[in-house]
């Protein structure tokens, strides 16, 4: 697994990097293949924004969340990307099964 974390207008502390890495590793454990994540943390005047992009076979998933608290934004983002990956996996399995049945 490869995780690239960058910050815009924020100094990335070891605690934030560790927190993001730990959350994304949990996502990787759920799925069978190697995943690469690109994470951008950004601080605006009133809110914190977190973006993650990952590449799956046949699809790129991009998720963006804004919140007042950085750690809450990370938690919300991980929940969102988890739902999108599960949806992708379910559709991928349905397509695989329908292809086998039609043969």
Located regions from the model:
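N-terminal, polar/charged subdomain of small-to-medium soluble alpha/beta proteins
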Residues: 1-103
């Amino acid at each position: 697994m490869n995780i690239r974390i960058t910050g815009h207008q924020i100094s990335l502390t070891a605690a934030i990097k560790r927190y993001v890495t730990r959350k994304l590793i949990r996502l990787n454990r759920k799925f069978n293949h190697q995943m690469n994540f690109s994470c951008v943390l950004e601080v605006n005047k009133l809110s914190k924004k977190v973006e993650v992009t990952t590449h799956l076979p046949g699809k790129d998933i991009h998720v963006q969340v804004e919140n007042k608290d950085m750690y809450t934004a990370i938690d919300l983002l991980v929940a969102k990307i988890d739902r999108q990956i599960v949806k992708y996996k379910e559709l991928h399995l349905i397509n695989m099964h329908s292809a086998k049945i039609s043969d």
